[in-house]
């Protein structure tokens, strides 16, 4: 778990706009999210983890326990249930809401982080890449 504590900065993305459109965002919202190029960091604190995302909009910290479902609210006030599972160099986040589910699979490989994004409402796959 050499990736713990490393800061990964956004590098590039593939098909992210397709994912955003599939979850019903307006063109204006899609354009805003396409500008979202955060850095991310995962820290372990005892039995819990803290996922830290920093962007021009500020800092968001999410504390979770692997395999335990938590309640959260995303931009726009939509309530969601999220489960993070940590397995070696992979952190899988499953998000469930009234609109469906999405999976964010974060694969850490040295100084690279690849996030694979899928959704129950979309046949496509999106990727976001980060570098430490």
UniProtKB/Swiss-Prot annotation:
Any GO MF annotation of the entry: lipid binding
SUPFAM superfamilies documented for this protein:
Lipocalins
Chain positions recorded as a fatty acid binding sites: 106, 128-130
Tissue expression per record: Midgut.
> What are the protein's UniProt keywords?
Cytoplasm, Lipid-binding, Transport
Q: Record's InterPro entries? A: Calycin, Fatty_acid-bd
Q: Which Pfam families match?
A: Lipocalin_7 (PF14651)
Location in the cell: Cytoplasm
Task of the protein = Binds fatty acids in a 1:1 molar ratio.
Q: What is known of its domains?
A: Forms a beta-barrel structure that accommodates hydrophobic ligands in its interior.
Q: How does it assemble?
A: Monomer.
Give the family from UniProt.
Answer: Belongs to the calycin superfamily. Fatty-acid binding protein (FABP) family.
Q: What is this protein called?
A: Fatty acid-binding protein 1
Protein species of origin: Manduca sexta (Tobacco hawkmoth)
Encoded by which gene? MFB1
């Amino acid at each position: 778990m050499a990736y713990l504590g490393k800061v990964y900065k956004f590098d590039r993305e593939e098909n992210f706009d397709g994912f955003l459109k599939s979850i019903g965002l307006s063109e204006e919202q899609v354009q805003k999210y396409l500008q979202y190029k955060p850095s991310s960091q995962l820290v372990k604190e005892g039995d819990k983890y803290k996922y830290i995302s920093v962007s021009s909009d500020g800092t968001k910290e999410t504390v979770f326990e692997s395999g335990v479902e938590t309640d959260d609210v995303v931009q726009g006030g939509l309530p969601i249930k999220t489960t993070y599972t940590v397995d070696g160099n992979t952190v899988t986040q499953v998000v469930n809401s009234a609109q469906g589910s999405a999976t964010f699979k974060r694969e850490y490989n040295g100084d690279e982080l690849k996030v694979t994004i899928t959704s129950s409402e979309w046949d496509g796959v999106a990727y976001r890449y980060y570098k430490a």
